[in-house]
């Protein structure tokens, strides 16, 4: 009698959990690729943990608080660690809708990954989209960064203008080269007009050219 009951239960489970069955999901794990030398062996204990995590996730869904580990069925387990699973409703003897299972897995994906030391790439639910990490908030607000950049640009521009003004003032103080030398040369030039040597007019000292003085002016004492 017990053998007949066991055979009946096994047959029902096989009918509910099979590849590509309604509401069934395929899972693929890459334990060796993720953990390397620290990889663990996938055995019945790991299967039990997986079923427990799925049952835990389902209990978070409204009206599914009574989900037990025995309600999660695994089938077609391979050595490369892939398998199919379904979640059953024992009262109605059928599998729960795929939408409910998918929602529960997505809400608790990080908890499931952490239980096996894996992530979305090494613990794949092939029909369930990967969860996206929340966007990272910058530690410094964007407006402060923009303000800092603009402030630096304005500071550099002001510094360049100040330096340019200082250089221009120095150039104006020095004056054009060669002006003073030309004036000195003009002071030493003596011109000759009508055979009479004439000293050029000294604009700086106010001297008068003796060549243009009359005889009375020369003899008149100062």
From Swiss-Prot:
The chain crosses the membrane at residues 142-162. The modification Phosphothreonine is found at residues 214, 220. Kidney; collecting ducts. Pancreas; beta cells of islets. The record marks 125-126 as: Cleavage by BACE2. GO terms for cellular component: brush border membrane; cytoplasm; plasma membrane. Keywords: Cell membrane, Glycoprotein, Membrane, Phosphoprotein, Signal, Transmembrane, Transmembrane helix. Residues 15-141 are extracellular. Monomer. Homodimer; dimerization prevents CLTRN cleavage by BACE2. Interacts with SLC6A18; this interaction regulates the trafficking of SLC6A18 to the cell membrane and its amino acid transporter activity. Interacts with SLC6A19; this interaction regulates the trafficking of SLC6A19 to the cell membrane and its amino acid transporter activity. Interacts with SNAPIN. The cleavage site containing the double Phe-Phe motif acts as negative regulator of shedding by BACE2. This is Collectrin. It comes from Rattus norvegicus. The lineage of its organism: Eukaryota, Metazoa, Chordata, Craniata, Vertebrata. The gene is Cltrn.
């Amino acid at each position: 009698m017990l053998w007949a009951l066991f055979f009946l239960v096994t047959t029902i489970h096989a009918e509910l959990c099979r590849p590509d069955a309604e509401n069934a999901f395929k899972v693929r794990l890459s334990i060796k690729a993720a953990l390397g030398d620290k990889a663990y062996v996938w055995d019945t204990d790991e299967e039990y943990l997986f079923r427990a995590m799925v049952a835990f996730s389902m209990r978070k869904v409204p009206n599914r608080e009574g989900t037990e580990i025995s309600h999660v069925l695994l089938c077609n387990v391979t050595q490369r660690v892939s398998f199919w699973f379904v979640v059953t409703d024992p009262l109605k003897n059928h599998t729960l809708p795929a939408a409910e299972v998918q929602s529960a897995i997505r809400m608790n994906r990080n908890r499931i990954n952490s239980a096996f030391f894996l992530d979305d790439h090494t613990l794949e639910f092939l029909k369930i989209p990967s969860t996206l990490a929340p966007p990272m908030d910058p530690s410094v607000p964007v407006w402060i960064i923009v303000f800092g950049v603009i402030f630096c640009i304005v500071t550099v521009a002001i510094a360049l203008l100040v330096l340019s003004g200082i250089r221009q003032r120095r150039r104006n103080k020095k004056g054009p080269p060669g002006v003073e030398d030309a004036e000195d040369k003009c002071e030493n030039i003596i011109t000759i007009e009508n055979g009479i040597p004439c000293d050029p007019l000294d604009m700086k000292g106010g001297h008068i050219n003796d060549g243009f003085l009359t005889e009375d002016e020369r003899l008149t004492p100062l």
